[in-house]
């Protein structure tokens, strides 16, 4: 079991060799993270989408102002996620656990999948301490959700505790890495020349505070077997040239229902939500 102390904060699942320049960059990144931590929680409260609109000025940022207004017509709420390099993974984790809090059957299946992933990681050669620390820590957390020990307010308190939240994130980083390694033949051709998949996973996926790139995003979505939609504030950022992108790829917009929807602003992801569909009430019988 992991002790919930700041000394145990994860930095990577493996040992990364760094140069002096890289250490300087890491120090600069950590300073930015510390500044961000002082300014915002890891996971914010749900807020009306009008909050997003208020961030942009019609005169100085007309394109973003227009897009924010368009989103506010489709989505009712936004949950801001701290921009610390973990925002995509954190948003996915929060969005998924929100679903599981209200879907016991899916929660039971998810726990079984997490335990299976622990075995898969061991077979892939991940260190035993990695699996016992990060995997067991996450599974214990999600089993407490299943058993009702962690209620919604407890879950969000944990998500906002640096001493525990980042251990939970490491499990998602590990299964992302594991999925890529299981499908190395499919993903290795997309890496920069001279970089092996093992190196990529160690430095870009398993290392904390690293932003998720396209390969990491696809791998996590597939590892979790979920469907997501990413809405883009910048119309030029979507891979298909549109205003949003569905994952896994190949789903038609008309039939695609995402489990989780993210908002991508340059370099950052937040969660956005549609208003729950209203249940139609039966018509009253005519008065005799």
From Swiss-Prot:
Sample GO molecular function, one term: cysteine-type deubiquitinase activity
Keyword set includes Transmembrane helix: no
SUPFAM superfamilies in the record: Cysteine proteinases
Residues annotated as catalytic: 84, 87 (nucleophile), 244, 268
Residues annotated as domain OTU: 76-275
Keywords: Hydrolase, Protease, Thiol protease, Ubl conjugation pathway
Biological processes per GO annotation: protein deubiquitination; proteolysis
InterPro entries: OTU_dom, Otubain, Papain-like_cys_pep_sf, Peptidase_C65_otubain, Peptidase_C65_otubain_sub1, Peptidase_C65_otubain_sub2
Alphabetical list of CDD domains matching this protein: Otubain_C65 (cd22749)
EC identifiers of the protein: 3.4.19.12
Pfam family, one: Peptidase_C65
SS bond partners: none
Catalytic activity as recorded in UniProt: Thiol-dependent hydrolysis of ester, thioester, amide, peptide and isopeptide bonds formed by the C-terminal Gly of ubiquitin (a 76-residue protein attached to proteins as an intracellular targeting signal)
Binding positions for substrate per the UniProt entry: 175
Family, per entry: Belongs to the peptidase C65 family.
Described purpose of this protein according to its UniProt entry: Hydrolase that can remove conjugated ubiquitin from proteins and plays an important regulatory role at the level of protein turnover by preventing degradation. Specifically cleaves 'Lys-48'-linked polyubiquitin.
Matching PANTHER family: UBIQUITIN THIOESTERASE OTUBAIN-LIKE, UBIQUITIN THIOLESTERASE PROTEIN OTUB
Protein name per UniProt: Ubiquitin thioesterase otubain-like
Gene, per the UniProt record: otub-1
